[in-house]
From Swiss-Prot:
Functions as an E3 ubiquitin ligase. Residues 198-391 form a coiled coil. GO terms for biological process: protein ubiquitination. Pathway: Protein modification; protein ubiquitination. One of its GO terms (molecular function) is protein kinase activity. Residues 688-762 form the U-box domain. Pfam families: PK_Tyr_Ser-Thr, U-box. InterPro entries: Kinase-like_dom_sf (IPR011009), Prot_kinase_dom (IPR000719), Ser-Thr/Tyr_kinase_cat_dom (IPR001245), U-box_ubiquitin_ligases (IPR051348), Ubox_domain (IPR003613), Znf_RING/FYVE/PHD (IPR013083). Belongs to the protein kinase superfamily. Ser/Thr protein kinase family. It comes from Arabidopsis thaliana (Mouse-ear cress). This is Putative U-box domain-containing protein 50. Its EC number is 2.3.2.27.
Amino acid sequence: MEETKTHELEVEAESGSRMEKVYIAVGNDVQEGYKTIHWALKKWNNIPISIVLLHLCNISQDFVYTPFGKLPASSVSEEKLQVLRKYEDQKIDKLLSKYITFCGKVCPLSVNFVLFGKSKSAISGSFYVYQNKPEFCEFYIICGGKMVSLKNDVNNNNSNIRSWIGKMFHDPGRNLDRSSGNNDDPTASGSSWDKNLQEIENYFQQLLSLNLAEEETENVVEEEQEDDDDVALNVLQHMDVAEKLEYVRRKVNEAKLMIDEKSREVKVNAERSNRAEWAISLCNSRIGEFEAWIKEESERREKLQATLDSDKECIEEAKNYVEKGKTKLHSLAELQEVLSSKVKTMMEAKSQAEVELERVVLQRGEMITEIEKLRSQRDVFNRRIEFCKEREVIGSVSKEEVKCGYREYVAEDIRLATETYSDRLRLKSGGNWTNVYRGRIKHTTVAVKVIGDSLSDEAFGAKVKLLNEIRHPNLVAIAGFCSQRPKCLLFEYMHNGNLRDNLFTSQRKSRRSKILKWHDRIRIAHQVCSGLGFLHSVKPKPIVHGRLTPSKILLDRNLVPKITGFGLIMHSDQSDTKPDVMAFGVLLLHLLTGRNWHGLLKAMSMNQTSILRDLDQTAGKWPLELAKEFGALAVKCSSVNRGGNMDFSTKEIMEELGKIREKADEFKTKGGYEEATNSNMDEGDPNDIPSVFMCPILQEVMKNPHVAADGFSYELEAIQEWLSMGHDTSPMTNLRLDYQMLTPNHTLRSLIQDWHSKRAAQASS
């Protein structure tokens, strides 16, 4: 019967903590036991544990260890049996005391552990404990102070050996790349393994069982031998001679038996050696095959590794490309966000600008309406002012002599005003030169008409007196005269030329031409009729113009018409005003159609509906009702010598024109046709010349504008000629110039060139 002596070393833990135990199995080898305990203390030095020392001893009630060997207890006296057992107990107690002294104080551990000191005599017991230990317990085998790795139990070892042998005998060519054409065919060598597979497996199992049996036998023999040696020292002291002889005889017989057994073992070992050489040769051949396969596998792995490295490089490049793409995408996303915010801001600004533009457009419309009203008021005031001035002049003439109502100039004044009758200041009419010059006297621009010697001094004086007596807002007023040769008459200067140059298309190349709208034409007709009616109402005899044509109608800055060229037939006996009425009717047709041809009157008389077809489109969209009435009045005036219109006077014409003008003003105030076409005609007509483009001297569009000291821009040739003639004053202000240096006006020149380009484009389209 085996007995286990234990000695438990415990250290009380803190209250409430649980003490776990570490079981350390020790044997009779003290040094080996010390190493095992030292390993356990080092492993759990910082953990509270309780150490339990285990010592296994074979104590049986039926057998006892004596110097003669293991004998039955019945063959030994009771006294000797007690002595032997007491000696064994003392030896174990001394051994445990040494272990306890070595341990010292230890701390408890929360897990149970079992440690076995490994020695040759404890191998089989260790395996037994390992196989039968509970699952919650950890098991360690310590040999020489170091942990020994454990193998599985015998059954697991057998199955593992079978599995290992099966893998070893399995054809590894199946796991290799079958596509390789250089591999050796493993069928021949594998067939020998297949044939000997079971035999080799049995051989290895036999070796394993023999090793375990021999180890156990050896352990038992060694243990018995050690025990016999220890016991023999004490037992032989109590034996007599006969017992000692019997003991020697038994030992001799045991030696003989041992020799026979060893002889048999030699034979068995020789057979086992042959079988081992046979197994080794098979294993060596198999190892060679495995090495060849391993080499092929290594080469294949190297190729796969190279391919893998190449793929990794491609993957890295792809990753880098993706990262760059992500970075670029992130940048584009940020840029898109910035652009989106800018677009949003611009859209908001655009919305605000559109709202502001609508507001400005409304304000512009209101301002245009207000400007038109102010212009109308200005025209009315100007006409009233002129009328008042004329009345004052007429009143003064009736009381004083001729020279008291106007001024007489000397020939030198006239030469200075006209720059000695320079052709540059000579005025044209319909492209033909006239005997009228533009001049400047006393800071006032005047028109100087050269009479020459065509009239005698008496006739010239009578003409001057007559012109001075006749004053009307729609008649050109005389400003002075010169009785010295050449005789001259001075009239107020009309800046917009005559009606012919402004009305007819062939004459609109003049720089001073203006686009006359339909309501302006009605107003001009009414004002011309007013001036003509004033001439016809002179007492005692009416003054007949006799040559009323568009060239005899001059326009001032405000497009107010004034009649010129009258007074030549005032002393004749002719008192019939019908020629003037007929001429006025033709003038109305000119205003309506903007055409100047001899068959116009005949065509209109034959078919009055053709008037609507031949309306002047540059005048804007005529109201249908006004166009019909205006055309009917024109035909009626031009047909005064035919039918029942013999007594049609200017007074009646004035009444009808007054009604037509009232309707025209009403249309214009309502903003009907006129506002719908006025902007289009202003934008599309290339003849509407900005005043800033005109040279103040030549009254033509400048080609090379230069700025003088007075701040005005002039044509270079004109201002140079002005300065070369000795003038040191401004042509516009008549003030002294501080210097005569001229500066090119590039900005104005660029604007003029752009204006010419637009005119050419509009003309080509």
